[in-house]
Amino acid sequence: MAVKEKIDRTASHYDAENIQVLKGLEAVRKRPGMYIGSTSASGLHHLVYEVVDNSIDEALAGHATEISVTIHKDDSITVVDDGRGIPVDIHPTEGLPGVELAMTVLHAGGKFDKNSYKVSGGLHGVGVSVVNALSSQLKVWVRRDGKVHYMDFNRGTTITQLKVVGTVAKNDTGTKVWFKPDDLIFTDLTYKYDTLANRMRELAYLNKGVGISLTDEREGQEKSETFLARGGLQEMVQFLNARSKPLHAEVVYIDTTHDDIGIEIAFQYNDGYNENVFSFVNNINTHEGGTHLTGFKSGLTRVINQYLGRSSINKKDKEAKLSGDDVREGLTAVLSVKVHEPQFEGQTKTKLGNSEVEGAVTSVMNELLNRYLDEHPKVANIIIEKAISASRAREAARKARDLTRKKSALDVGNLPGKLADCSLSDPVLCELYLVEGDSAGGSAKMGRNRNFQAILPLRGKIINVEKARIDKVLSNEEIRTIITAIGAGIRDDFSLESTRYHKIILMVDADVDGAHIRTLLLTFLFRQMPELIEAGYIYLAQPPLYRVAKGKEEYYAYDEKERDDLIARMGGNDGRTSVNIQRYKGLGEMNPDQLWKTTMDPNTRTLLKVNVEDAVLADQIFQTLMGDDVEPRRQFIEANAKFVSNLDV
């Protein structure tokens, strides 16, 4: 997806010869993935985000306080705001009403004009015109100057020219957009309420004082919520820490402007061992971090070390040099910056590159956090004690950590897990199977393609990293084996470029124990190597549940429906030859040839790629299911038990 770019409307090259390039929506319909990422569920939801981003831009400019989103019975969407309303006057050079330009021209909008919007949200920035292009129908009502103006469109083409359809009070302004996604474009036309709710909640936290309501009118799913966070990021941190035990009641909060950059920071420590830091730029979730996050982390480390130096703590602890990992253990933090012209980079264009932002955030941390700690010594001492405790654990883990650092490819020969490596060395071509059990590991080793497939058998269940400190995590032999085999390190030592395999495949039994082992592995990867998930390197193998055979015919089924369909297709037990059905309870029940054919052969296997669409929600779920607190886990199970379709008892 392309990042928002600024168009200079006064530039000499923006003339008639450029109109076709800038205005053609046909390119959007031909290659929608370039504009919204995909035509699956992700892209479908992105249409809503794009329209809501326009309303949020009005809020950022101080002109909107209420936004409503409605999912109608036919999965069409309405978004309403109380902003100024999209301009309806005729554009001086284009000869079209402003609203028609916004709806039919890529990159046409006030957000590209510094005088209209100082900052604007939305990652790709192509505007609501893309929503128009990818909708079978779109209608827009603009409340402005005491009148209600109306237009409608069909697949990006204007059907009804701008006209006045009603009157309102002079101070009643805003925009209403209704659209129905095009079934010729999207493979899935069903909106997920929870997906939209998570984003609306996030936007409410990031834009304090703006109320965002979400209503579902679909039969049997009727629901409505309003998200409003007057405390902004403070409330977001409280939400994130709801399933943890905070070490101090008050959320540390900074909200200021430095060199024309808006900086909002909120954080709170809990008694856990994981670091949960979320960063945003102009409401965009910067999954890959960037200069703002670097400024926050370095500033936090420096300030806490400075405070340690002037504190009244004992001399031995006072001499400790706290690392970034030490001061961020148990930290839940949210950082949001507002930048006029953000420069994005990285694999998914979600990494901030503006160098000036790092200095601004560091300066703010140095000045305001130092002042806060001096004014709140009780909170400061809690943070210091937590960091010192982490430092001691880090020192205890140092030797174990050193064992995990892969110096060369020769190191794998000493792996306690007996890695069967592949002969190719190009990480792009290589795959690593993490296999449950020695028995299945043996079958996988014999059945694999030795050129590009490596096998690492795992003995038993690894440690639950959600409940353990880093020294305990690294004392676990299986964990050390996995880290060394992958070769990229963990946490601050992690380097994606050093990863030895670009496909890391979790292959476990299709039973409760297998699911538990898979969950433990995913917890470890999410907490210690999240970059692997973000890069799309983590996959789940899908071994079959059944072997269905009749005579010389042999097929494999991955669920009960597929099994029953196969039995019916094979004629069932026709009296001459009976159908033989084998239920696989473990990978070890398959011989090497069967394991290759069903689960490992790139031409016939099915792999599920692990991705994190909502990092906040993923963090909450891992805390709930894998953390110490039993009550939230019980509530989660009670609420979701009805959705379980495959239960081993």
Say what each PLM segment does.
Residues 17-30:
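Mature N-terminal segment immediately following signal peptide/propeptide cleavage
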Residues 30-49:
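Conserved short strand/loop->alpha-helix "switch" segment adjacent to the catalytic nucleotide/phosphoryl-transfer site
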Residues 86-109:
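Short conserved segment of the HATPase_c
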Residues 92, 345-357, 556-562, 566-570:
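Helical (often loop-to-helix) elements that flank the catalytic cores of nucleotide-handling enzymes
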